[in-house]
Amino acid sequence: MTETHLATGKHRQEHAWPPRAEGGDARNDRVRGTWAFLASIALLALASAGQPAGLAAERWVRSSARDLPVSARVDILVVGGNEGGLAAAWTAARAGSTVLVVTGNYFFSDDVSAKARYWLEPDEVPQGEFSRALFAERSGGRATLTPAQYKRDIEDLLLDAGVAFHFNSKPTGVLVDGAGHVAGVVTANKAGLQAVIAKVVIDTTPTGTVARLAGAVTTPWSVQQVQVSRVSYGARVPGGRQIGEFCEYALDAPMPDGSWPQRCRAEVLLREKHDRVDGKRAHAQCLHMIEPVCLRTEAYEAADRWPGADQLDLGCCLPAGVPYVYVLGQAAGVSRSIAEQLTRPVPLADLGERIGRRAHQQAAARVWVTGGLTPARSPGAQAAARDWPSDLAVRPDAAAVADAEADVSDLLTGHRRYVRSSLGTVPQPELAIPVWGAYDVVVVGGGTSGIPAALAAARQGAKVLIVEMLGQLGGNRELGTPGYWKGYPYGFNQWKWRAVEAFAELRQADVDIWYNTLACGAVKQADRVCGVVLATHLGRGAVLGQVVIDATGDADVCAAAGAGFAYVNDGDLCLQEASFRDVDLYANVLPLDHADVHSLTMHHVLARKAGKQDVWDYYPLVGLRETRLVRGDHVIDVIDQILGRTYRDLISVSWSAYDPHGYHNSDLVYAGLMPPTKHETKPGFATYIPLRSLLPQGLDGLLVVGRCLSVTHDVQASVRMNADLINLGYAAGYTAAHAIRSGATLRTVELGPIQDHLAEIGNISREDRLQRCVDSPEPTDAELRAALDDLESKPQLAMLLRGGRRSLPGLRAAFASAPTLAKAKALCVLGDAAAVEYLAAWLDSQPLGAGTAYQWDAFLAVPDVESVMWLLGVPRDERAVAALVRKLQQCGTGGTSFSHLRAVTSGLGRIGSPAAAAALADFLRRPGVQGHVDVRGDPQSLRSDQFVKSYIELFAAGALVRCGDCDGLGRAILNAYLEDWRGIFVRYAGHVLAEGTGSGGEK
């Protein structure tokens, strides 16, 4: 590697490449062992002439044939988010085309914001309408841009023009019609894979990935190294170029073929030279480089001087032999000097307007016909252009893969799981996914749990890769909601825990890091997960591992692999609030459905609109507290917490108080088993975490760490603290390496040495190691009888309920002889209807009392009236309906009625009696209850005083539908919410509607 001094152009030799690994023989043994493992899944060596750079591979894994859901049908699809594509989208949309932009980041643009190149060069003078609108007040001299304002301005321009866009979506394939012409793109994101049908595609990726996937070819890659650069804000890097507070520094990185691992290695080399991570500072998410190759296009511009956007031959942007595709960026057929200009925002934007006009005309003229396309010349051509072909398919690879035991598993539920009108599917034939690497341990997610997992495994001698979706390490701890609140104050988490220090430790441990790499699938051999499918701006690739650790925070790999999970709690609208830094100082906002692409995109856009307008930049992530909760071999519930349940496979301890950031949903909490709250215990309480809660049920080779481990919603509120997740990740990484080294599986690994090590470093105490690494026994009959005498005691109630159906005979007898409210509640929790009449009469005898208005930290107690209304729904006995209806009629429509309404509508909905339908419909017809659907996206809808209105409307409508509905009112409301921008409302409404059709809800 050589360092390039941008100011002088001088080079100096720093060290040889590649660096020699310490303990070379051991490392080589690990590599040989890993590739021996690969042989077991029957990979096939193939050659493929048409693969994009970065997809060249000698090993491939099979992706069997499947149907992909269609997420959109548009006239023009823009892939990538540089200023050229944005200007083209803006221009075409204003001319009348339907346009969708998909970009891999959570913001625009790829060449300015993503690289933190927030300046205009002195010769950049806006000429076009779009560039003048964006830059008019910023041009002149070397003007610098304010990151937050720049991102907002782009989004405002696109939204005003009617352009739709999806963030965090990357291209993975192309669609073709019967004639073999491009008719759309396959995208990957946190919702899985989707197809977008389009008449014209504008490819703004730096490598022309869409064009290459469609068969375009490039000039030869004939260099061994490439100059790469990176920008840091507020720092001076030796040899760098200073532009205001920005510093761009460069080096020459080895890159003999441009593969994705080589590009990621270049990212690491740049960060080894200088690394600084600060979520609200405009640091680069990715490196800058000029590709040494270009596409072969219909024309080529060989001059070194930029001719101007109005003079460049547009044939330079048309890949040879690939109609209906434009390349708009440095992949165009131009000299590499001009390619540099095509990474600058003003030239790109001005050229983009020309291409936008041309693309609009071409889309209007393209008419789909069976077997191909014909140009439209008749007056009815525009109407015919809206007809879509029935013969679309994903373009197959040049070579097919022979039958293999391993296969790729994807999420195929669509970009919005319960979208009202299906756009259909397109067939994907069997494909070959290139393998980009193989490791002992693959950690997906370089955040709070992922970094310690990788360090622990690597320090035990494992060959480890971190796959990170963003361009920075740190995850939610560093980039979403920074800081600590409670947590177990011992062990690995006591290390100085910042992303910069973590990066240095990872490199010292020889951990590879792949930035800007999205996990979009799993490689499976039967029920064993043996790799991950990745999406990048080069397309798809796979990395294989003996153990995969899902540290995504959202259980993305687990979900793709087919693991079961709870999400929005399976039909109960209950999810902890998110936080978006800089909306307020520490704003709690609407919970985010990360697997709804439209909602995820709008959440970021609206948070920027609603937030403080004078901030320098925004944190790159919405700080999520809860998304998917995986169903592991054991699901920790509040009974386990109250009893302090221990496990023979104990590997971590959480220490916190109950901190729901919303409300509870467990029958156990309503029965009286709320864990100690932050008002009851300042230091917190212990929850013991077993290995089995990190093992997704039915899957081998896979561990899940972070906030999505196998717990219930109400437990998760006290085990998701950053300090605890650091220790949890470390334990998982250490366990993975130990299992590999000993030749065991994750379920058969010897736990004693692992627990000894965790006690040695303080992750668990020595007392825990000696006394609590055992399974708590099941309650004895004597203990169950004793519990009946004191059900006001949380431990005694928990003991009784842990007994399950064994507790029922004694509980029934005790209630019959001496009925009490506590015994009646316990019977209901266990699903027994013996106390329903007693509770209904008790409810009628009680005033409704004061309820609790919605507030993020308000629900730290359960009044008896609300407890009874909720629990009466558990046995599903219609004798409770009349009393519940009378309480519903006493409720107000908002404010402090929120907690009452949640409890009573839940009770009625679970019983599902038609006798309650009229009362629920009457409630919905009260003034102010209906009409809170938000399709377009009001920035204020992020705030609790607004979204709580939708909560109440949805609680009542969901209960009404479950009770059989009344004049179609409930279904009409839920159907309307299927178009709401807020994904959690779409998911809840869709789940309730699906219950009645037998189509089911979540896994």
Briefly describe each language-model feature range.
Residues 105-128, 471-492:
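Conserved N-terminal glycine-rich FAD pyrophosphate-binding loop of Rossmann-like flavoproteins
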Residues 9-12, 16-19, 24:
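Short, low-complexity, charge-dense intrinsically disordered segments
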Residues 71-82, 435-447:
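Beta1/beta-strand and adjacent pyrophosphate-binding region of the FAD-binding site
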Residues 777-787, 804-816, 832-855, 877-891, ...:
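Amphipathic alpha-helical scaffolding segments comprising HEAT/armadillo-like alpha-solenoid repeats
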Residues 55-68, 111, 123-135, 151-152, ...:
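Flavin (FAD/FMN)-binding glycine-rich loop and adjacent Rossmann-like elements that form
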Residues 161-171, 507-519:
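A conserved beta-strand/loop element that lines the FAD pocket in flavoprotein oxidoreductases
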Residues 792-805, 809-833, 841, 852-877, ...:
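Structural detector for internal amphipathic alpha-helices that build alpha-solenoid repeat scaffolds
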Residues 139-153, 340, 490-501:
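Short beta-strand to alpha-helix junction loop
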